[in-house]
Structures are given as structure tokens and as C-alpha cells.
């Protein structure tokens, strides 16, 4: 019986540690049942209340024709379009921001090669339009407008419509041709010209009389001289001969000279180059749709405000930067500590040191109290706004950092790529590795700052309350204060809004503190009571056992023999 009484006293005493009957006020922060894990400088897994994904992984499976102008080459690549191959007439006069080359594009005319194909392709793509200016060329005593069965247009033998195939005259003559064109305009001119390589010496003399032929094209700053390479080659569209196409840019005030004794594929004019255009080219099989997007990749369009993407390295327009990571989360809320279940017999409350509060929905920080009038919860808007102000704009600042640095690095790498083409892939891989690391580091820095800021605001709120209460309350060590005076809801509100006057309650608090401390059982007293209770219980059990044995012996129920 005594043990039961002592046990009840201990339970009551243990419960009174959580709530003594004095008012309690706790500081806490918002929490959710399931937060989001983010990475910081010091920890790979930190749970926060809210976070924003920064890496776009969703793609529109089509190319958007607005706001960027797209030109679909269909069966023609951009070089065939510039040469005027059959089937490319739809590209005459075309203008674009992005020229779409299809993997299914095919050559449809006389077989050719371009020794500096990628450079010509880049010049044409960057120019953003096919603005062809026809010119008159005076070729003497030669036959013009050569045609080929390999180049059908409407089932009739034809040729590249931007070029003029010169062969010997009907009188079997191909005299030296020397023709000069001066650029008197205010723009640069692009001339595309070619050299025919026959398959046999007989073909050479049948077409040009002279063997070998020669083509020399010069400007004030450059000269290209080509001697035809005569020889048999695999048949392509019925032809074993080939044409090599070259290109020359003539700046304003410069001139171009064509000198040949045979094999020249002459231009019919020039393309006007626009130095102000910033167009490009994209090789993809993705169809053009009716959507709107400023960003295109070889896998489709992106419509996003995220600063990074993990869809394709090839991205054109106003696009997120490509990174290797599939996910980078930016913390937009505080550290998350899910709320524990109610503790104790009397539902004791706890503050931010032990857990967050899932019921705090009007702010990030707030108060809970327990007094004679009941319990309550209220948000603290001042500390909430202070934290939000420091976090707002974090995503925009991150985008500004990445954009500024990316453009600088991009320019440096482009110069390297232009000079050392063998290093192009290595440079691209290095650029992506660098930006993937950069992005991860920037996000980790911002996440660390967010968590530090939100923790700091929580501590500021706690210190603000502690300075108000002073000796009128006791810090319980869990984010709560036990108040040693009567504190109704108005009093609690004054603590929350910073108008609490501790001098008014000082005397009452001191008296109550001493009275409570005088009657509290210390840990030593509890130990003594437990030992006394245990000893008495053991004594009673032994006494009862001995009494039972004596009673049984007297009644003959137990016989006891002692042998010596």
C-alpha cells in the first residue's frame, strides 16, 4: 500500500515538471509532417519546410515557332539551300532565328564536298537569311549554264541554281578567264564557287579542252588556287566526278578576282551578310508545333523559369544552363523538425529546441502559451517578415550569378573552340563539368545561408522574450519559459508584442519562485523515498512468508526435520 502511494506521488511529481500550475510561454517555428531534403555546405541531407526545384526535367515534344522564327529545311540542309539544290526552292529568301536541319536531309544534285563545311555552315546559319543578290558576270568564249542528269528539277536535267557551270565553247575553246568584281556596297559579300573534278582525262578535255585545268580566286587579303583532281570515284547518282565548293568573303572596298583555264563552277551572285544577326542552326527530328517558347533543344522546347536543365547539352535561345545533376533544390523555408505527439499526462507544451509546430499556419515563427485561461497559439509576424525579406529574391539572385559568369566563360571557350577544333569536345565537357560543380556549390551556399538566417531569427525572438521576462520567469531549456506570476491572456499578449513590463510583476514573481522552490522535492529526496519504499516492501514480503510457514507447521501441514 505504501509503495502504491509513493508511486502515485512520483508520477504526480514527474508530471508537475512539465506544468506546475504556473503560466508557460513557448517560442516555436512552423513545421510540416514531411519536409524536403536539401544540400548545404556542411550536410548532404538537411530537411527544410519548403524548397524549390531548380533543374528542369520536363520537355515539350515539339519546337515552338514563337517568339523565335523557325525555318524548316525539310529535305534540305543549309548548305544545299545556299547552293540552290533542287527541292530547296522553298528556302529562297528565307529568314530565321533558328534554321532547323533534319537528320533526313539528302543531297539532290551533283555530288559535292565542301573542304571547310562547318565554317560555311556556321556563316550561313549566323547570317539568319538567304538574301541572294544576282550579278552579271562577263565570261568570254565559253559555254555557260551546264547541266547534269544527277541534278533533276521537275524531271529535267538541271544544276544548282545559284551557280553557273562553265564549259568549253562550241568552237572547242576555253581561253583564260580573268574577271574582277569590286564590293562598292556597305556590307560584306559571301561568294560561293566551285571546282569540278572529272573522273577521266577524256572527260576533262571534252568539257574544258585544257588538261590540267586550274582555278584561282583572290582578294586583297587571300588567295585560293585549286588544280582539279582527275580520277575515278564511286558512282553517286550516276556520277563518278565530284565538285568541291569553296567560299570567299569580300569586305566593303575589297574586290574578288576569278582566274581560270577550266573547271570553274562560277557564282551567279553573292549572299548579303548581316553582321548584326545572331541566328543559329539546330539539327533535330522534332516537329514544329504551335506552342510558345524561347528555348529550343534537339529534344524539344523548354518552357520554364528554372535556372538549370538536365535535358540536353544543345540548347538555343533563352535557356537554362545544362548541368549533370538531375535535381538541385533551393531551400525557401526553414529547417524542418516535425512536431512530436503530446507529452505527459497533462499535455505539456514544448518550444523550438524540441520540435516545430505543424499548427502554426499564419507565420514562420510564433508563440504557444498555457495559463489559467487555457492554451493558445499565435504567429509572430515581425520575425516572419524579417526572414522572408532575406529569402525573397534568392532565386533571381542565383539566376543573375549563373548568367553573368556563364556568359564570360562561354566567350572564353568559344575563342578556344574556334582556334583548336580538336579540343572542342574536351572543352564542352569541361564547361559542363565546371557549371555542374558551380551550380551545386551556389545552391549549397544559398541553402546554408537560408538555414542560418531562419535559425538566427528564431534565436532573436527567444532572446527578445528572455530580455523582457528576466527574473520573472525561468528558462525551461526547451524553448519555453515558466512564468512565476499570474499571467492572463492580456499579459501573454504583452509578451508577444514587446510591451511587457517586468517591474509590475517582479515582487509577485520573486515570492512565488521562493515558495515553489521550498516545496519542490529534490532528486536526492526522491532517491531516499524510493529506497525506503523498496526496503519496506521487501520486509513485508519476508514477514508474510515467515508467518505462513509458522502457521503451516502448527497445523501439521508442514513437517520440519532437522538431522545431525
UniProtKB/Swiss-Prot annotation:
**Residues the record marks as carrying a glycan:** 18, 34, 178, 310, 497
Question: Annotated site (Cleavage), which positions?
Answer: 343-344
- Lipidation (S-palmitoyl cysteine) occurs at 553, 560, 563
Miscellaneous = Major glycoprotein, comprises over 80% of the envelope proteins present in virus particle. The extent of infection into host organism is determined by HA. Influenza viruses bud from the apical surface of polarized epithelial cells (e.g. bronchial epithelial cells) into lumen of lungs and are therefore usually pneumotropic. The reason is that HA is cleaved by tryptase clara which is restricted to lungs. However, HAs of H5 and H7 pantropic avian viruses subtypes can be cleaved by furin and subtilisin-type enzymes, allowing the virus to grow in other organs than lungs.
Q: What is this protein called?
A: Hemagglutinin
On modification after translation, the UniProt record reads: Palmitoylated. In natural infection, inactive HA is matured into HA1 and HA2 outside the cell by one or more trypsin-like, arginine-specific endoprotease secreted by the bronchial epithelial cells. One identified protease that may be involved in this process is secreted in lungs by club cells.
Q: Which family does the entry's similarity section mention?
A: Belongs to the influenza viruses hemagglutinin family.
Please tell me one Gene Ontology term that the record gives under cellular component: host cell plasma membrane
| Pfam families named in the record | Hemagglutinin
Q: Which residues lie on this side of the membrane: Extracellular?
A: 17-527
Q: What is the annotated localization of this protein?
A: Virion membrane; Host apical cell membrane
Is Hydrolase tagged as a keyword? no
Disulfide-bonded cysteines: 26-480, 64-291, 76-88, 109-151, 295-319, 487-491
| Gene from which this protein is expressed | HA
| Topology with respect to the bilayer | Single-pass type I membrane protein
Transmembrane region positions? 528-548
Signal peptide span: 1-16
